[in-house]
Amino acid sequence: MSDAVILRSVKKFGEDNYGFESSTFYNNDKNSGLQDERKGDSSQVGFFQLFRFSSTTDIWLMFVGSLCAFLHGLSHPGVLLIFGTMTDVFIAYDTELQELKIPGKACVNNTIVWINSSLNQNVTNGTQCGLLDIESEMIKFASYYAGIALLVLITGYIQICFWVIAAARQIQKMRKISFRKVMRMEIGWFDCNSVGELNTRFSDDINRVNDAIADQMPIFIQRMTTSICGFLLGFYQGWKLTLVIISVSPLIGIGAAIIGLSVSKFTDYELKAYAKAGSVADEVISSMRTVAAFGGEKKEVERYEKNLVFAQRWGIRKGIVMGFFTGFMWCLIFLCYALAFWYGSKLVLEDGEYTAGTLVQIFLSILLGALNLGNASSCLEAFATGRAAATSIFHTIDRKPIIDCMSEDGYKLDRIKGEIEFHNVTFHYPSRPEVKILNNLSMVIKSGEMTAVVGSSGSGKSTALQLIQRFYDPSEGMVTLDGHDIRSLNIQWLRTQIGIVEQEPVLFSTTIAENIRYGREDATMEDIVRAAKAANAYNFIMDLPEQFDTLVGEGGGQMSGGQKQRVAIARALVRNPKILLLDMATSALDNESEAMVQEALSKIQQGHTIISVAHRLSTVRAADVIIGFEHGTAVERGSHEELLERKGVYFTLVTLQSQGEPTANAEGIRGEEETDGVSLDNEQTFCRGSYQSSLRASLRQRSKSQLSYLAHEPPLAVVDHKSTYEEDRKDKDIPVEEEIEPAPVRRILKFNAPEWPYMLFGAVGAAVNGSVTPLYAFLFSQILGTFSLPDKEEQRSQINGVCLLFVAVGCVSLCTQFLQGYAFAKSGELLTKRLRKYGFRAMLGQDIGWFDDLRNSPGALTTRLATDASQVQGAAGSQIGMMVNSFTNVTVAMIIAFFFSWKLSLVIMCFFPFLALSGALQTRMLTGFATQDKEALEIAGQITNEALSNIRTVAGIGKERQFIEAFEAELEKPFKTAFRKANVYGFCFGFSQCIVFVANSASYRYGGYLIPNEGLHFSYVFRVISSVVLSATALGRASSYTPSYAKAKISAARFFQLLDRQPPIKVYSSAGEKWDNFQGQVDFVDCKFTYPSRPDTQVLNGLSVSVRPGQTLAFVGSSGCGKSTSIQLLERFYDPDQGKVMIDGHDSRKVNVQFLRSNIGIVSQEPVLFACSIMDNIKYGDNTREIPMEKVIEAAKQAQLHDFVMSLPEKYETNVGSQGSQLSRGEKQRIAIARAIVRNPKILLLDEATSALDTESEKTVQVALDKAREGRTCIVIAHRLSTIQNSDIIAVMSQGIVIEKGTHEELMAQKGAYYKLVTTGAPIS
């Protein structure tokens, strides 16, 4: 295929020539997009590219914000100038006092002199005195502090406010542009990018970019300004000491940078592991009925836990690195103190180059510079995370779609006949390039005709329909419409000419009327009613309480398969399309409904092209032309009679299907609460591009094996009127999250009890670390006090002693910081893992009715597992360390402060609440501004999820723009909120920064009063103020976790509520009756039942029917009569409200749940497969033991699956993809049958078990099922008479009761409801 020639893009604007290109080039172009997507992860975007969406206004906001951040950064070095001068004033004053205390010295004429006994003055000393008014000096310095406080308040407010507003504006654009771009992508791109990852990109990744460009940016500028100016001030004041200190400072900066980078890396690994665990949880909870039916709870908990272990390891490593490097930095800082004061005091005392104030200025300037340089690394972490997140977002934004559904390019034909032709089309899906689906396909579909396409599973029928819609482009050849290559036509225009109805139709979470209106935006209510009547949907809609305003639930979950299909047909008919594509469109309808729909289709056939993929004889026979497919090629074409005479593919299919059918129209028995229609032979064999791959998430809210009505889902605002969501929320009784009492801390700690040794050692480390700050204040003030001593040797001795203490404190800090970091990381991660595991286990142990509750949707539960478990650490883990640290800090600081000056301590204590509050506010600011309006963003997230999960349907009906508009409308609320929050946060940040200067201003002013009036030593003033101010800010940082603490208690309460809940049907309980000789006798005794989520709808109304061991019972009846509900009662998904289900004479309520389910095997119409290998999916049939490979192969052979599996490259190790998306419907169904067979159950439940198979496969599988039924009790729900006519008992149900029962012959003889159903296909009333 390397140099095969293909036709491509033949009619573009400005050119009429037919261009020829090498398919190699085109295929490479296609695949390169996917490869680039993967490459994009390795090369991050440049930092300034983060601001690519900034406007002129944004640039001005950022410029002014940056200028204010620069001025704010200057304030700290400015304070050091004041502090150094003030230190010199204090020392000069104290030196004067010390000298005057010497006997024989006095102050005469502002000079200190010796006074001899004769009163003659000796003026050789010459030291000035009496000129320094310490109190007035302190007033001056206090005013300087107050002035800087005002500057910091204003600049701090502006820098944060302006940057946050600019970021909000840019993030708003980024969200809009990225969603618009994703909605433009071709379907092949979605095959290779999971919906879950894309949703994460819209939420988490964009939030991370926001963190990078919002408040972190001005804080980074501020810190860097402080850092640079600090170093410059140090060099200016004294280069010698600066060079000595600066030799150590890079190590501090490096340590801080390593922390930032390591934490970022480990967090990334940890999040990836949690994401995998989250995907497992989502898959399992979405498929809860299958998990319960096959007793997979324990296995799924183990699978979930495996991913949690990886996350735990990375979390602990992160704690170790943080603990070590935090200790390393503290150690370096204290060693730096020791070195600076030792060498600096030498320069002050011996060389006289510096004053003590200059020494303090230089030292604190360099320390301030290094610390701010290190702290800036936390911003670098946010920038790195933002860049990493932006890489995938920008790659998506910059990628050019191969098929751009919103492109204005291409022709729009004035008149369209609807003649479609395939010219030597070869095709493979982008996600499976090695599997050829269409192979040199050539066929003509004429206008005004109904063309039926038939063929076995995997022959390429539905793929051909997707190429007509231009979901994909052929690898070779071309598809033409009225002679025009469809690649030259405008894609939006093309799709408006096409109506599509799929076998598994997707309805959106809004009203029935709006769902039909999706077919045509300007459709009036009359048009909608007309279409509903044509689709035979009008009667059942009018029977609903709210008629056309009835909400269909997520994915149409409130409706049966037949009802959904009729609404989808109405949606297609309302647009009056020139081309109508029907992919098993009437498979879920009974004969009467189908006949009415076929009549409606025949009416519009004139001037329209109708292409139908079907295997019902009645559907196919009505076609003008039938085309037979085999191995991706059209092998025959003709009318029904012509093809029967030819005796080819069609003849084989008809022969197989007609065998055993007693009447021509005897297929109309259709199930009730079933999900979607008869799944036939979807051809995309083993390809993620299979026709159903985009439908999975919309069907997740109810497991494919559940065939009952579910709880109402909240609607989304993806309709023409943006207010619909709000109106619906007001009008409908949608449950809200109930208020919950916070959990007691004692119980949280009890849950963390196994880690008590780690917590104990961590608490010891935290206590020591808490004492370090007040100890620093003590030592620092002690050194300053020595400079006023008159004896130089005494000064030197005391300074050396204090320097040695600094070294000792540094070494201790290294150990205790590491101990605290490691111990609490270990205990916290183990707690999180335990909570997630127990929470997940408790979820899987709940009864199925619990999952029907809106609040317990898969999305809500997986979110609860992720967020609540992490939030519980807010009351345990590292938070305990923070609290112990702060408590020790404050206690030691208060002892020191009150010991040396209780009066000054009380004055500073007045600012304590403000200082604590400022610390809390500041810490909360620095954690980032990612707290957008949660509710509105969740709704926006629901819109993206619904749009992307159902992208094929959205693209097919051309509603991309409508989803985009709805998404953008939901973004307005958090966008407006961000402006308000920017002002609040800006003020809080400014206040948190300035309050320390205000406190210092008042404290030094009062200290200036106490020194002369009460004889307080100046070093005590420094000691008391430093101790209290530093401890207050530390307390503030601790109190900033109060919201986390409160959230933790609420999250823990939700967990404990889940753990404490006693489900009415206890899966994990070992209690209940078990017996050895399980026979399989089943008796339904006067069973009455309503679903917990729909208590006003009586589903079973006194069901009574029995089946003896080894017999087959078949349920038949119209939609909604309760057939599948009876199966759910037998599985004990629910218990009857009244009556009993008896198993071998035992009341099912008293039977052990796991024992009961282990003896039941089930095959559903839409089987749920898990994202693992074919072998593992088959083994899932029996989770009580390890199944040998021989048994797996044996089961596969019985299910007619083995040959297909062996034809795959990886055979039984082949991964089936998410929800089995890599397989066709027939292949999935056979895996499900093998899964049931390997279980070797005593009771076999077949719920439309062969409906998804083509006629050929069905016959072979039916033989396997007949064999599997031998010796087993079997309960069958089906609508093909060939499936049920040989049953021992046929029970005809209507409105929740059995109205007739007997064998096929007996019921036909009675000429009642069953006879009517068989002979006319009329529904049972």
Curated annotation (Swiss-Prot):
A GO cellular component entry from the record: plasma membrane
Record text on activity regulation: The uptake of taurocholate is inhibited by taurolithocholate sulfate with an IC(50) of 9 uM. Pravastatin competitively inhibits the transport of taurocholic acid. Cyclosporin A, glibenclamide, rifampicin and troglitazonestrongly competitively inhibit the transport activity of taurocholate. The canalicular transport activity of taurocholate is strongly dependent on canalicular membrane cholesterol content. The uptake of taurocholate is increased by short- and medium-chain fatty acids. Cholesterol increases transport capacity of taurocholate without affecting the affinity for the substrate.
Positions in the Cytoplasmic compartment: 1-62, 169-240, 341-353, 781-798, 916-983, 1036-1325
TM spans (from-to): 63-83, 148-168, 241-261, 320-340, 354-374, 760-780, 799-819, 895-915, 984-1004, 1015-1035
Protein name: Bile salt export pump
Quaternary organization: Interacts with HAX1. Interacts with the adapter protein complex 2 (AP-2) throught AP2A2 or AP2A1; this interaction regulates cell membrane expression of ABCB11 through its internalization in a clathrin-dependent manner and its subsequent degradation.
Tissue expression remark: Liver.
Localization (cell): Apical cell membrane; Recycling endosome membrane; Endosome; Cell membrane
PANTHER family: ATP-BINDING CASSETTE SUBFAMILY B MEMBER 11, GENE 2, ATP-DEPENDENT PERMEASE MDL1, MITOCHONDRIAL
Top-level lineage group: Eukaryota
Enzyme Commission number(s) of this protein: 7.6.2.-
Protein's job: Catalyzes the transport of the major hydrophobic bile salts, such as taurine and glycine-conjugated cholic acid across the canalicular membrane of hepatocytes in an ATP-dependent manner, therefore participates in hepatic bile acid homeostasis and consequently to lipid homeostasis through regulation of biliary lipid secretion in a bile salts dependent manner. Transports taurine-conjugated bile salts more rapidly than glycine-conjugated bile salts.
Catalytic function, reaction form: cholate(in) + ATP + H2O = cholate(out) + ADP + phosphate + H(+); taurocholate(in) + ATP + H2O = taurocholate(out) + ADP + phosphate + H(+); glycocholate(in) + ATP + H2O = glycocholate(out) + ADP + phosphate + H(+); glycochenodeoxycholate(in) + ATP + H2O = glycochenodeoxycholate(out) + ADP + phosphate + H(+)
Main location: membrane
EC main group: translocase
Domain ABC transporter, first and last residues per copy: 420-656, 1082-1320
Topology of this chain in the membrane: Multi-pass membrane protein
Organism this protein belongs to: Canis lupus familiaris (Dog)
